[in-house]
Each structure stands twice: as structure tokens, then as C-alpha cells.
Amino acid sequence: MCSPTQPTLAAGNVVDQLKRAGSAEEFFTLLGVCFDPKVLDVARLHILKRMGQYLASEDLEAMPNSVAAARCKAVLERAYEDFLTSTPLDQRVFKVLKDAVAPKKTHFVPLETLK
């Protein structure tokens, strides 16, 4: 499904509008990013989490609204593309998925403590 090429953001703060978005589809529509519903059905939370990771070091509030909107769009496209070529299991953006492949810690119990 392809959203319009122009974002559907209303006049005002892009960050506030994205905070009010109720679904991943709304993020894509607001920012004017095309998406495949099949990909979004499987990886919606992963894509949005990755978008947040990419934006974590940026101060969107300090940017002019048009620049912030363009930056959000570019980052959402980048996050979405991450999941076009790999799966959420490959990307492991959530802690539970990272922990699943982390080496298991062995616990050492000294023999003296077993008396």
C-alpha cells in the first residue's frame, strides 16, 4: 500500500502529531512513506522501535518543523528498509530477542559453600 507522496501532516508540530498517531499505518501515512501491509503486519513494532533508536540522538524539537518532518520521513524509510531485507529475529531490536541469543552466564558455586 502506498501512501500519498506528500505527507499528510497538518500545520503544527510534527512530533506532536506523531505522538498522537494510533497505529504504525498512521506514522507511514502522516510522513508519506509507502509500505507493504504484509511487512507491517509482521514487523510494525520493530520498525517503530528502530525508528526511535535512529532518532534518539536527534533534537527534533529544536529543528524547524519542515526539517523535522523530512528527518522523520527519512528515518522511517530507513527503519522500514531494514525489515524488507531481514526479519525481526535477524534485527533483534527488542531486549528479549537479544537475550535469546546471548551467551548464557554460568554460575560458580564454591565447593566450601555446600557444607
Swiss-Prot record:
Disulfide bonds: none annotated. The keyword Cell membrane does not apply. GO terms for biological process: nitrogen fixation. It comes from the Bacteria. It holds the Pfam family NifW. Keywords: Nitrogen fixation. Homotrimer; associates with NifD. Belongs to the NifW family. May protect the nitrogenase Fe-Mo protein from oxidative damage. NCBIfam families: PRK00810.1. This is Nitrogenase-stabilizing/protective protein NifW. It comes from Rhodopseudomonas palustris (strain BisB18). The lineage of its organism: Bacteria, Pseudomonadati, Pseudomonadota, Alphaproteobacteria, Hyphomicrobiales. The gene is nifW.
